[in-house]
From Swiss-Prot:
GO molecular function, one term: proton-transporting ATPase activity, rotational mechanism
Lineage: Eukaryota, Metazoa, Chordata, Craniata, Vertebrata
Organism encoding this protein: Danio rerio (Zebrafish)
Pfam family name, one: V-ATPase_C
InterPro entries named among the record's database cross-references: ATPase_V1-cplx_csu (IPR004907), Vac_ATP_synth_c_sf (IPR036132)
Gene: atp6v1c1b
UniProt keyword annotations, A-Z: Acetylation, Hydrogen ion transport, Ion transport, Transport
Protein name (database record): V-type proton ATPase subunit C 1-B
Cell inner membrane among keywords: no
Complex formation: V-ATPase is a heteromultimeric enzyme made up of two complexes: the ATP-hydrolytic V1 complex and the proton translocation V0 complex. The V1 complex consists of three catalytic AB heterodimers that form a heterohexamer, three peripheral stalks each consisting of EG heterodimers, one central rotor including subunits D and F, and the regulatory subunits C and H. The proton translocation complex V0 consists of the proton transport subunit a, a ring of proteolipid subunits c9c'', rotary subunit d, subunits e and f, and two accessory subunits.
Protein function: Subunit of the V1 complex of vacuolar(H+)-ATPase (V-ATPase), a multisubunit enzyme composed of a peripheral complex (V1) that hydrolyzes ATP and a membrane integral complex (V0) that translocates protons. V-ATPase is responsible for acidifying and maintaining the pH of intracellular compartments and in some cell types, is targeted to the plasma membrane, where it is responsible for acidifying the extracellular environment. Subunit C is necessary for the assembly of the catalytic sector of the enzyme and is likely to have a specific function in its catalytic activity.
Family membership: Belongs to the V-ATPase C subunit family.
Amino acid sequence: MTEFWLISAPGDKTCQQTWDKMNMATAESNNLSTNNKFNIPELKVGTLDVLVGLSDELAKLDTFVESVVKKIAQYMTDVLEDSRDKVQENLLANGVDLVTYITRFQWDMAKYPIKQSLKSISEIMSKQVTQIDNDLKARASAYNSLKGSLQSLERKNVGSLLTRSLADIVKKEDFVLDSEYLTTLLVIVSKTNYPEWQKTYETLSEMVVPRSTKLLFEDQESGLFSVTLFTKAIDDFKQQARENKFMVRDFLYNEEEMKADKEEMTRLSTDKKKQFGPLVRWLKVNFSETFIAWIHIKALRVFTESVLRYGLPVNFQAMLLQPNKKNVKKLREVLKDLYKHLDSSAAVIDGSVDIPGLNLSQQEYYPYVYYKIDVNLLELK
């Protein structure tokens, strides 16, 4: 399971006793979950008013940062295109996989100095992730524009002979050029009509050059034929061709234009390759930064809610549980039995009641502090 439960309970005589009791009830006795202590340093508490306000702000920040983490992960998938099997190896936090990072979580003192107030630390995180989100939008927009232009040109090289680019199909020698009297037309003929075309093309107009047709290219359904005729017979030929279910494609051979299209495709393809490496590196680095910020926000939320629930002095144990998939319901029941004494109203709580300062949706209200962390960021099954 990629789901973790980050919970806290007040210290008994010691926080170690709280840990031992929970671990014995869930992991050692019943194998309901895999557990780790979640280390939160001694943070500055501040006033109760500040904590209540901060609880609301952290809930919003948590949602925002999680959305940025998922956006970066999803965009990494989009950018890697044909190498999607390599996505997970690029989604790391501090160089380790996400499960390892969470289960061995250590507060980053350099990024988020604990001498600062809780509000200041949350503002550092908010500013950092907002900047990453803005950078992501700008980089994604530039890369997507480049990718879109390239795909648009590539689409011209596939599809129907009526619409696709002919730059890689026709050559200069396929046409009569710079003639005052003669011109070359391109005609699309379905494969079933090849015999009919060969039999009739010379008679579709009075001024068709005999034996001038040539098959230049064919796809699964049709062939592209050239035919040479007098310029003044073009309109008559087109009309007769249409009546015989032969499609004349409007095409003017322009070497410079076709060369420019090829050069543009080469340029776009080169630019995309040049941007690919730096973009993947940026995504990798900033995924790590954002994920780390997200888990620190979870730590801040646990700290704030624990103080609001359990009071001062600060005395609680934060614990990370990874539920065994088949035992989720049983685990919840064991935790309820373990901690129901913390909140006598928990058993009869009204789903419509809003509990000030706790900022938990009612379907996730428990007598202990609880937050879910799901590291299945790409929603892979």
